[in-house]
From Swiss-Prot:
Residues 129-188 bind DNA. It comes from the Eukaryota. Expressed in the ventral marginal zone of gastrulae. At stage 11.5, also expressed in the ventral region of the animal cap (ectoderm). At the end of gastrulation, predominantly localized to the ventral and lateral regions of the closing slit blastopore. At early tail bud stage, expression is maintained only in the forming proctodeum. SUPFAM superfamilies: Homeodomain-like. This is Homeobox protein vent1. Coiled coil: none annotated. InterPro entries: HD (IPR001356), HD_metazoa (IPR020479), Homeobox_CS (IPR017970), Homeobox_NK-like (IPR050394), Homeodomain-like_sf (IPR009057). GO terms for molecular function: DNA-binding transcription factor activity, RNA polymerase II-specific; RNA polymerase II cis-regulatory region sequence-specific DNA binding; sequence-specific DNA binding. Transcriptional repressor. Cooperates with vent2 in a ventral signaling pathway downstream of bmp4, which antagonizes the Spemann organizer and dorsal mesoderm formation, and leads to ventral mesoderm formation. Acts downstream of bmp4 to repress transcription of foxa4-B/XFD-1'. Binds to DNA with preference for the target sequence 5'-CTATT[T/C]G-3'. Also binds 5'-TGCATTTTG-3' at a lower frequency, and occasionally 5'-TTGATC-3'. Binds to the homeobox 2 (HBX2) repressor element in the promoter of the myf5 gene and represses myf5 transcription in the ventral domain. Residues 16-140 are annotated as: Disordered. The N-terminal region is required for repressor function.
């Protein structure tokens, strides 16, 4: 009995030991992921060197490549082929650090924004220059009108003298005279159109000539035939009755004789 109980206890103890050994083995096994995990971000990826000197930039890029290669080598990966690829790529010169594309896009975006701002800054100035119009005072307008009534075209010395007297520039006086001449031209054209009546279309008439066709009035020389006087017939037509001995056939027609009759 003692041996039997001892054997049962041994079996239970062995089963417990096996269970604990299985748990320890499960916990000690490394986790093998299905896909390679991404690398943690580094300070080189966040802030790329933006110095103008080419040597400093090359040093930063080489140190960044070496740090990435060491991280890949030291980190255990499930797929050994990926590790070998990372090792080979770390030593090659064609490795491009992440963030270079972002820097290029940022620089292009900044250049486009700067161009837009420059165009916007230039456009309001040009618009203001076009929209600016000199506001003449009534006294200046009256003096300009008097000078225009005397002389419509001013020479250089006269224009300069008038501009100094009115406290204006020569360009302002010149543009005012040009606009005033155009205004006068339009007024004259409007008056001419109002005085001239609109053209009326009348039907064209032709004279009647008894011996010929109607001839238009604009023809200079034309032939006029001589009109003949009316002549009465010499003998009057008197119808005579038919005799009884004359027989008419179905194929013959008999007409009365004509004595000196004329057809008109």
């Amino acid at each position: 009995m003692v041996q039997q109980g001892f054997s049962i206890d041994l079996i239970l103890a062995r089963s417990k030991e096996e269970a604990t050994d299985g748990k320890d083995s499960m916990s000690s096994r490394p986790h093998i992921p299905c896909a390679p995990q991404p690398l943690p971000p580094t300070k080189y990826a966040k802030e790329m060197p933006r110095k103008k000197d080419g040597q400093d930039v090359q040093e930063h890029t080489t140190s960044f490549q070496c740090s990435l290669g060491e991280q890949v080598i030291n980190r255990p990966s499930a797929n050994p082929s990926l590790a070998a690829m990372h090792r080979s790529s770390g030593s090659s010169d064609e490795f491009s650090p992440p963030g270079s594309e972002d820097d290029s896009t940022e620089s292009s975006g900044r250049s486009s924004q700067e161009n837009d701002t420059e165009q916007r800054e230039k456009s309001p100035k040009s618009d203001l220059q076009r929209r600016l119009r000199t506001a003449f005072t009534p006294q200046q307008i009256s003096k300009l009108e008097q000078a225009f009534n005397k002389q419509r075209y001013l020479g250089a010395p006269e224009r300069k003298k008038l501009a100094t007297s009115l406290q204006l520039s020569e360009i302002q006086v010149k543009t005012w005279f040009q606009n005033r001449r155009m205004k006068l031209k339009r007024q004259i054209q409007d008056k001419q159109h109002s005085l001239v009546p609109p053209p009326v279309c009348y039907p064209q008439t032709f004279p009647y000539y008894p011996g010929g066709f109607p001839v238009p009035l604009n023809s200079g020389s034309f032939y006029q035939p001589r009109a003949l006087p009316f002549q009465a017939p010499q003998h009057s037509y008197i119808p005579q009755p038919l005799h009884h001995h004359v027989r008419m056939s179905s194929h013959q027609e008999q007409y009365p004789p004509l004595f000196g009759a004329q057809y008109m």
